[in-house]
C-alpha cells in the first residue's frame, strides 16, 4: 500500500513539474528601416521543429517551449537572420541585408570596402544613371558629385562636356580627368559608352585615390564599370524611352520690340551729336534721325527702316519716342520689310527616342552579357541631331578553381550633325531686321531651295545689313553640312590566376580604335561660300591605343590584422593620325559633297601623325587593424615620351590613413551615431598632358618657288619636366539615426608646382618664346555631401541630397 501511494505521488509530482515548465512566448517583429511590422517572418525555437510565422501585425506566439531551450531564430528573406534570447514578451528589430552589406567602391586597379578607403571618392550606381534620359554617360554625374564641374559649350546633341574635378590645375596642360573603362584607360570618348550598359561610375578626387594611375590621373579619375552577367537563367531586359527637349535657359532681358530698339539707338546717337560733336539740340535731333536709318555704319547707320510714316516727318520725335504716325512694315527696292523673331525661329521642340535590349545569364562557370542600343536625338536648333548604335559582348569563364578569364568587346557607330551657328546670330541680331525676304504683298518669297531668307546683302535682298552681313544662320543650317561620323571598337581581355592561397596574378590587355570623319560643305547659293561657288573640306582622324597591365596581388589576414599588397607594371601606347583637305567650286552641291565633287584646289592639304607612350611600375600596400585603423601607401614610377630622355622618369606617391571612431568602446553608448570616420591623405602626382615635341626645336616644311625650304616653328626646351601636383585631403564621414542621415565633409588643398608656361623672349633671338616649368597654382576648398531619408517604407523611399563645394 505504501509503495502504491509513493508511486502515485511521484507521477503526480512529475506531471505537475512538467506542466509548470512549459513556456509561452509572445513577440513582435519590426523592420529597422521604418518600424513597420515584418509579415511572414519565420520564428523557430533553436534546435527544435517548434516554430511559427508572424501575422499581419508582425506578431507571433510560441507555446510548449522547454526550459532547456534558450534561443529563438528569426529569419526573413532580404533581412539579416537573428538569434535572440527567449523572454516572455519580445520585440525583435530586423535589419535589411542590403543595409548591413558594406558598400564596395571601385577604385584604382580593383575594389575596396568603403570603410577601409582612405581617399576621396564618390560612386554612382546604375539606378541613378539610367533614371534620366542622358545621351552622354557623364551627364548622369551632373549634380551628383561635389567638386565636379561640368560645362556644355554649345548644346549640340551628342556634345561631349568638359569636366573639371576640384578646379583647374594647369594653365597649359590639359585638365580633363582620366577615363577608365572596366579597369583599362579609355580613349574612345564619353559618347561611345551606352549609359544602359553601365553598372557604376566612381569619381576619384585625391592623391590617395588616383596616385596609382600616375601622370594620367593627375586631374582626377573617372572609373566606369559596365554590367556583367550573373549565374542563372537567361534574363532579357527591354527598355524604351521617349522624350522631348526644349530650350531650358531663361532669356536675358533684352530689347525685343523694334520701336524700343530705334528709340534706344536714337538716344545714343543724339547724345553723341549733342555732347561729342557740339551740335544744338535741333541739329542733334536731325542728325540722329537721319544717320540712324542711313547705310553708313560708321555714323551709326542701321540701314534698315521697317516703319512707314508721313513724308517730312522723322521716325523718332523730339520727345525721344517713336512717331505715333509710324506703322510697322515698309517697301524698299521691291521688298516688304518687317522684322521677325530670330530666336523663336532658331529653336524648336526636339524629340528623342532610345531603345536598349540586353541578355544575360550563365552557369556557375561561364556567364555572358550581350546588349544592343539605338539612340535618335533631334537637336533644339535647326539642322542638329545625333544618331548612335551600340553593341557590347562581355563574357567570363571559370576554367579551373584557380583560373578565370574573360573578354569584353564593344562597338559604337555615331553620326552627328551640327547647326551652322544660328544661336549666336539669333541673339546678336537687332529686332528690326527681317529673317525672310518678302514680296510687296508681304508674302515670303520662294526659290528652288524653298523659303528665301534675308542675308543682309543688296545683291540678294533689299539692303546691306551692317551687322552679320552675308549671313543667315537659320537658312545656312538647312543647307550647309557639319557632319561627323565615327566608329569606335574597344576590346579588352583578362586572365586571373590564383596560387599559393593568398596570391593572385592578373594580366589585362586592352585596345581601342576610334575612327572619325568630319565633313563641312558650304552651299554655293548664299553666304560666304557664294563667291567660291561652294566649298568642301574633309578631315579624317584615327586613334589607336594599346594598354597592357601585369598585376600581382597578395591578401592575408592573421588575427585582427589584415594586409593587402599589390605590385604591377603598365605600358600604354597611343597613335594618332590625321588627314585634311579642302576644295572650292562644287559641281553638284546636293548630290556630291565630296572632294571629287569640287574642281578648285586650295593648297590646303595636310596630314599629321603622333605617338605617345607611357610606362609605369606601381605598388600599393594596405593595412588595417580590427576594421578600425587603416593605412595605405601607394607609389608609382612613371615615364612619358613627351619629355626629353634625361627627364622622362618621375616618382609619385600617396599616403592615407583612416580611423573609425564608432568602433571604439567609449562611443558605444551613443546609440544614434552609426558611423564616424576620420581620414587623411597626402600625395604627389605628375602631369604630362602637354603637346608633343615641346622638348625639341620644330620646323615647318615650306614650298619656296617649288624648292624645299624649312621655316623655324617653335623653340624646344629639353629641360621641361613634369608638372607636380601635391594633394592634401582631410575628411570626416558619418551616419546617424540608423542611416537616415549620412554624409561627408572634406577639405582639400592642391598645389601645382613647376607649371608649364610659355616664356617670352626678345624677338632678336630669332624666336618669340619657349615653354618652361615656371609657374605655380593653388586650389583649395571644402566639399559637403549630405543625404537624408525622411520617408522609407516598403513602397516609397524619399531621398533628399545636398551637395556643395567652395574653391
Regions found by a protein language model. Give the residues of each.
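Short, contiguous hydrophobic alpha-helices characteristic of membrane insertion segments
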Residues: 364, 368, 617-635
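Short glycine/threonine-rich loop-to-helix capping motif typified by GTGT followed
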Residues: 645-649
Amino acid at each position: 500500500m505504501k509503495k502504491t501511494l509513493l508511486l502515485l505521488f511521484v507521477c503526480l509530482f512529475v506531471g505537475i513539474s512538467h506542466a509548470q515548465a512549459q513556456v509561452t512566448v509572445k513577440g513582435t517583429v519590426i523592420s529597422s528601416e521604418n518600424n513597420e511590422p515584418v509579415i511572414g517572418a519565420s520564428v523557430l525555437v533553436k534546435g527544435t521543429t517548434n516554430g511559427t510565422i508572424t501575422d499581419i501585425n508582425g506578431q507571433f506566439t510560441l507555446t510548449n517551449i522547454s526550459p532547456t531551450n534558450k534561443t529563438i531564430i528569426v529569419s526573413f528573406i532580404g533581412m539579416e537572420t537573428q538569434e535572440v534570447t527567449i523572454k516572455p514578451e519580445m520585440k525583435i528589430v530586423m535589419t535589411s541585408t542590403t543595409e548591413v552589406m558594406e558598400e564596395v567602391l571601385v577604385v584604382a586597379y580593383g575594389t575596396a570596402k568603403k570603410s577601409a578607403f582612405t581617399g576621396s571618392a564618390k560612386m554612382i550606381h546604375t539606378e541613378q544613371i539610367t533614371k534620366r534620359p542622358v545621351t552622354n554617360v557623364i551627364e548622369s554625374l551632373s549634380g551628383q558629385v561635389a567638386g565636379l564641374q561640368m560645362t556644355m559649350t554649345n548644346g549640340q546633341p551628342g556634345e561631349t562636356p568638359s569636366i573639371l574635378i576640384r578646379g583647374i590645375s594647369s594653365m597649359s596642360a590639359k585638365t580633363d580627368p582620366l577615363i577608365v573603362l572596366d579597369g583599362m584607360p579609355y580613349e574612345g570618348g564619353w559618347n561611345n559608352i551606352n549609359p544602359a550598359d553601365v553598372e557604376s561610375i566612381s569619381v576619384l578626387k585625391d592623391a590617395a585615390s588616383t596616385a596609382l594611375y600616375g601622370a594620367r590621373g593627375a586631374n582626377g579619375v573617372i572609373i566606369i564599370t559596365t554590367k556583367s552577367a550573373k549565374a542563372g537563367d537567361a534574363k532579357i531586359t527591354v527598355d524604351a524611352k521617349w522624350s522631348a527637349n526644349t530650350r531650358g535657359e531663361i532669356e536675358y532681358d533684352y530689347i525685343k520690340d523694334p520701336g524700343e530698339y530705334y528709340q534706344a539707338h536714337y538716344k545714343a546717337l543724339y547724345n553723341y551729336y549733342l555732347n561729342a560733336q557740339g551740335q544744338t539740340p535741333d541739329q542733334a535731333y536731325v542728325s540722329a534721325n537721319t544717320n540712324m536709318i542711313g547705310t553708313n555704319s560708321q555714323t551709326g547707320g542701321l540701314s534698315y527702316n521697317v516703319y512707314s510714316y508721313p513724308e517730312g516727318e522723322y521716325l523718332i520725335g523730339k520727345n525721344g519716342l517713336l512717331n505715333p504716325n509710324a506703322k510697322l512694315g515698309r517697301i524698299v527696292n521691291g521688298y516688304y520689310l518687317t522684322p521677325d523673331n530670330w530666336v523663336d525661329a532658331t529653336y524648336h521642340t526636339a524629340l528623342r527616342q532610345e531603345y536598349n535590349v540586353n541578355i544575360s545569364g550563365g552557369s556557375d562557370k561561364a556567364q555572358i552579357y550581350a546588349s544592343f542600343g539605338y539612340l535618335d536625338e533631334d537637336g533644339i536648333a535647326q539642322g542638329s541631331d545625333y544618331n548612335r548604335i551600340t553593341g557590347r559582348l562581355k563574357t567570363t569563364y571559370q576554367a579551373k578553381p584557380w583560373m578565370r578569364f574573360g573578354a569584353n568587346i564593344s562597338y559604337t557607330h555615331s553620326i552627328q550633325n551640327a547647326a551652322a551657328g544660328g544661336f549666336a546670330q539669333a541673339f546678336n541680331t537687332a529686332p528690326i531686321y527681317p529673317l525672310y525676304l518678302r514680296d510687296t504683298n508681304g508674302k515670303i518669297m520662294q526659290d528652288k531651295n524653298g523659303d528665301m531668307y534675308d542675308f543682309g546683302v543688296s545683291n540678294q535682298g533689299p539692303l546691306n545689313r551692317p551687322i552679320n552681313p552675308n549671313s543667315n544662320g537659320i537658312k545656312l543650317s538647312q543647307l550647309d553640312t557639319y557632319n561627323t561620323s565615327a566608329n569606335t571598337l574597344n576590346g579588352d581581355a583578362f586572365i586571373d590566376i590564383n596560387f599559393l592561397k593568398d596570391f593572385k596574378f592578373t594580366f589585362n590587355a586592352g585596345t581601342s580604335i576610334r575612327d572619325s570623319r568630319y565633313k563641312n560643305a558650304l552651299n554655293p547659293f548664299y553666304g560666304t561660300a557664294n563667291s567660291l561657288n561652294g566649298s568642301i573640306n574633309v578631315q579624317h582622324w584615327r586613334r589607336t591605343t594599346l594598354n597592357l597591365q601585369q598585376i600581382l596581388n597578395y591578401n592575408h589576414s592573421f588575427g585582427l590584422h589584415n594586409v593587402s599588397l599589390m605590385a604591377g607594371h603598365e605600358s600604354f601606347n597611343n597613335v594618332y593620325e590625321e588627314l585634311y583637305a579642302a576644295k572650292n567650286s562644287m559641281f553638284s552641291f546636293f548630290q556630291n559633297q565630296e572632294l571629287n565633287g569640287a574642281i578648285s584646289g586650295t593648297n590646303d592639304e595636310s596630314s599629321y601623325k603622333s605617338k605617345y607612350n607611357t610606362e609605369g611600375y606601381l605598388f600599393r600596400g594596405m593595412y588595417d587593424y580590427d576594421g578600425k585603423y587603416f593605412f595605405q601607401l601607394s607609389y608609382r614610377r612613371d615615364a612619358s615620351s613627351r619629355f626629353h630622355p634625361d627627364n622622362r622618369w618621375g616618382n609619385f606617391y600617396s599616403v592615407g590613413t583612416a580611423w573609425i571612431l564608432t568602433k571604439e568602446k567609449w562611443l558605444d553608448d551613443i546609440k544614434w551615431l552609426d558611423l564616424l570616420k576620420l581620414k587623411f591623405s597626402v600625395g604627389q602626382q605628375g602631369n604630362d598632358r602637354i603637346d608633343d615635341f615641346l622638348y625639341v626645336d620644330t620646323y615647318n616644311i615650306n614650298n619656296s618657288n617649288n624648292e624645299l625650304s624649312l621655316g623655324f616653328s617653335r623653340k624646344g626646351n629639353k629641360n621641361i619636366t613634369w608638372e607636380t601636383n601635391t594633394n592634401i585631403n582631410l575628411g570626416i564621414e558619418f551616419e546617424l539615426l540608423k542611416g537616415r542621415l549620412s554624409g561627408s565633409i572634406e577639405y582639400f588643398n592642391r598645389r601645382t608646382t613647376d607649371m608649364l608656361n610659355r616664356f617670352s623672349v626678345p624677338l632678336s633671338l630669332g624666336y618669340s618664346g619657349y615653354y618652361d616649368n615656371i609657374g605655380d597654382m593653388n586650389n583649395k576648398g571644402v566639399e559637403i555631401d549630405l543625404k537624408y531619408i525622411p520617408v522609407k517604407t516598403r513602397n516609397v523611399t524619399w531621398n533628399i541630397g545636398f551637395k556643395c563645394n567652395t574653391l
